[in-house]
Amino acid sequence: MMAKKRVATDNAADAKMELANRLFFRLYQCANMLHKTGTRAVEAEGLTTQQWAVLGALSRPTVANGMSVGDLARYLMVSRQNLTGLIGRMERDGHVAVVPDERDRRSRLVTMTKSGRHVWEVLAQPKIRAYYGEVLGDFSINDVTHTLHYLLKILDNMKRLDDGAAGETAATDLE
């Protein structure tokens, strides 16, 4: 009897791992397709999905005065190194400005320029909404709510893993 339970448990674990593999592969495919089709949706405005994410982050009322490069990197969950190059290109294109933080001169704030706000609100937003409509057109509100719920659970678990890895790295550095 105990052997049957162990086999059933092993089979359930194998089935879960197979589903996990399929889930993460689909997430990978979705990320790639978001980059490809999302960029296509806003390329007429000279934007990529990464720039779309930066402008979206900076458009929030809570950060109307800008965000530090570090805070923006943490919010977008990207490295400061990757973000620095992206911000440089966006600054060159006139979408953002990088200014010293009045509260801490060592820190730099990234703010959306008037031109960047126009690109975001007037040019990009209608195309982004149309893109969302095409991608999620056959989703009910419940479908979107449940999908968001499960993606947030996955993201929280990934953050916990990342935080644990950062703690391990810090501990190793102290040795």
Curated annotation (Swiss-Prot):
Record domain HTH marR-type: where: 20-156
A Pfam family it matches: MarR_2
A GO MF label: DNA-binding transcription factor activity
Keyword flag DNA-binding: yes
Residues forming coiled coils: none
GO biological process, any: response to stress
Record keywords, A-Z: Activator, DNA-binding, Transcription, Transcription regulation
Entry function: Transcriptional activator of genes for the anaerobic degradation of benzoate.
Protein name from the UniProt record: Transcriptional activatory protein BadR
